[in-house]
Amino acid sequence: MVSTEEAINHSGLDLEKIDKLRVGVIWGSGIGGIETFQNQMLDHASGDGTPRFNPFFIPKMIADITPGYISMKYGFMGPNYTTVSACASSANAMVDALNYIRLGYCDVIVTGLSLIHI
């Protein structure tokens, strides 16, 4: 989040004047939450069979949490998703961002990469 905030501040974007419907967030994630998923499955398998999961299981596991949080923080209402394609994730996110702008669907796309093993 710190790098996103710095990027937006350095961009010169006037958040009061832009059309937030035309600002999207496309993020890349090489992998996210796999350790969380593994731990939950092991806990479930070694338990009594009752399907109990940590309430943070989904938020810690899904790769799309980052662009969602960025969009909510800044009120961006354009395209919002994560590309997951191993080492090419950030490149795919940047190409998607370029195409949204090039084709006239958006004026601004915030793009980046997160690689988290939690």
Task: Set out the residue ranges of the language-model regions.
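Acyl-thioester C-C bond-transforming condensing/cleaving domain
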Residues: 9-19, 27-116
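N-terminal amphipathic, basic-rich helices that act as targeting or association modules
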Residues: 1-6, 15
